């Protein structure tokens, strides 16, 4: 296996063992730089990420890598700045990603390059860390060419392509929303990569809302707020991921409001992603909500069967692994939640087959994914837990779902609860009616059918149901 395959398989294994926050903030932006003589060198972009990996995830990371490669592995975590320090005295050219600027408290010795080898005489491969850590800003693998287009994401793909070809023009801001692992981050990176391919002098910055918040906190602590503002307000294209996490953070929202205004008034392009539409982000300031709605809002839906099949075939080709059509079909039918889990399942199957020297068959896939498929069969969640999740999502009390209140702000959440109870539990219509204040089973049937019909035409409602379902999956530990 090459480094990319090893790292993807490791991430797939760790995704189910770590919190979403740790996975997104610490693991996904990291990169396996080399694996030589039993030492895996992991590259990260900041001291915060390094500290988080070493303090919270070092043991799980070491164990996962050991399982993937089949022999004991030690882990070293290295910061991109270590390799960049010899060059940082030169002024960066336009288009250079400012996230790689050196931190004053990084004290590790500089490491100009790394080698990777399999310990069996394979030629060492030189890796330029600055290029490798571009994945912390723009991942060169995430392009429009590598994005599989289907009915679930065609509009989002077209809008992103239009922005990349004409930044600062139409669809500003562009707001993408949808569930976890559906390709929003891929599209953000694809925009940035295409913009820079067409004009390397354009300043592009990809950043998560969490990093924006952390940078602001650090700037305030170090009394460097002006430097922070210069960094974020002197760019041509801002790509900001998971904006929902700034909700409820007053200082972050205030700073982002002014950043947005500065960039937008200068005809700089802003592309934002979220797991829900602006109207559904509770505690988001109204002035930000209205600005997010100035441009185009597009939802990214879960892939249909044809798209899942195409994604798996493209992934197998990228991995240079032959996967029989019947196995592709098996995975496409079994893994329906999101693209990340779909690709992760193929990584696991390929790694399992290689490590056990087995052909890739449906039996091999079933064995490799036994825990995942077993969870799908055994998964249970209480009806009360679903009611709690629904009520928290809509900002109401569970008792309001049970009451006779017929105002729309309660009726819709109640019908969503009926629908999800029917879909996610084995409760009968009568059981659901009793749970919701003794309602007749025909009322429950009407509510379920109404939501089932409207999610096909109402993108806002569909995103609401998707977001709630994701919380249900997280509670199940899937």
Swiss-Prot record:
PROSITE patterns (UniProt xref): DNAA
UniProt keyword Cytoplasm, yes or no: yes
Entry's localization field: Cytoplasm
UniProt-annotated stretches for the region Domain I, interacts with DnaA modulators: 1-71
Location of the region described as Domain II in the Swiss-Prot/TrEMBL record: 71-136
Family statement: Belongs to the DnaA family.
Organism: Chloroflexus aggregans (strain MD-66 / DSM 9485)
Name this polypeptide is given: Chromosomal replication initiator protein DnaA
């Amino acid at each position: 296996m090459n480094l990319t395959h090893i790292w993807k398989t490791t991430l797939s294994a760790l995704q189910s063992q770590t919190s979403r926050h740790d996975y997104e903030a610490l693991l996904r932006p990291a990169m396996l730089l080399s694996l030589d003589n039993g030492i895996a060198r992991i590259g990260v972009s900041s001291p915060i990420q390094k500290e988080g990996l070493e303090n919270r995830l070092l043991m799980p990371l070491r164990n996962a890598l050991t399982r993937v490669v089949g022999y004991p592995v030690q882990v070293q975590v290295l910061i991109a700045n270590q390799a960049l320090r010899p060059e940082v005295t030169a002024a960066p050219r336009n288009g250079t990603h400012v996230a790689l600027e050196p931190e004053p408290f990084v004290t590790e010795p500089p490491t100009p390059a790394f080698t990777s080898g399999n310990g069996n005489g394979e030629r060492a491969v030189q890796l330029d860390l600055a290029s490798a850590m571009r994945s912390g800003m723009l991942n060169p693998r995430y392009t429009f060419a590598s994005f599989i287009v289907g009915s679930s994401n065609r509009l989002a793909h077209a809008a992103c392509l239009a922005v990349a070809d004409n930044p600062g023009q139409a669809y500003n801001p562009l707001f993408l929303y949808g569930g976890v692992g559906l390709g929003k981050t891929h599209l953000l990176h694809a925009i940035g990569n295409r913009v820079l391919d067409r004009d390397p002098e354009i300043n592009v910055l990809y950043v998560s809302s969490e990093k924006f918040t952390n940078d602001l906190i650090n700037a305030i602590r170090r009394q460097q707020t002006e430097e922070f503002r210069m960094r974020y307000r002197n760019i041509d294209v801002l790509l900001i991921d998971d904006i929902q996490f700034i909700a409820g953070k007053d200082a972050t929202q205030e700073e982002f409001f002014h950043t947005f205004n500065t960039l937008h008034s200068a005809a700089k392009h802003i592309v934002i992603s979220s797991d829900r539409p602006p109207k559904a982000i509770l505690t988001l300031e109204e002035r930000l909500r209205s600005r997010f709605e100035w441009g185009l809002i597009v939802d990214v839906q879960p892939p249909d069967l044809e798209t899942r099949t195409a994604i798996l075939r493209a992934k197998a080709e990228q991995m240079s692994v032959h996967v029989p059509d019947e196995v592709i079909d098996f995975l496409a039918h079994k893994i329906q939640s999101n693209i990340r889990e779909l690709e992760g399942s193929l990584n696991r199957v390929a790694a399992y087959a290689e490590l056990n020297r087995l052909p890739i068959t449906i039996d091999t896939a079933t064995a490799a994914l036994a825990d995942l498929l077993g969870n799908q069969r055994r998964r249970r969640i209480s009806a009360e837990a679903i009611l709690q999740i629904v009520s928290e999502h809509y900002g109401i009390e569970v008792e309001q779902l049970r009451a006779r209140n017929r105002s729309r702000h309660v009726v819709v959440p109640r019908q969503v609860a009926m629908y999800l109870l029917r879909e996610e539990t084995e409760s009968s219509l009568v059981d659901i009616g009793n749970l919701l204040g003794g309602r007749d089973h025909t009322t429950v049937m009407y509510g379920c059918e109404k939501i089932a019909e409207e999610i096909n035409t109402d993108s806002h409602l569909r995103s609401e149901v998707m977001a709630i379902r994701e919380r249900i999956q997280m509670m199940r530990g899937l």
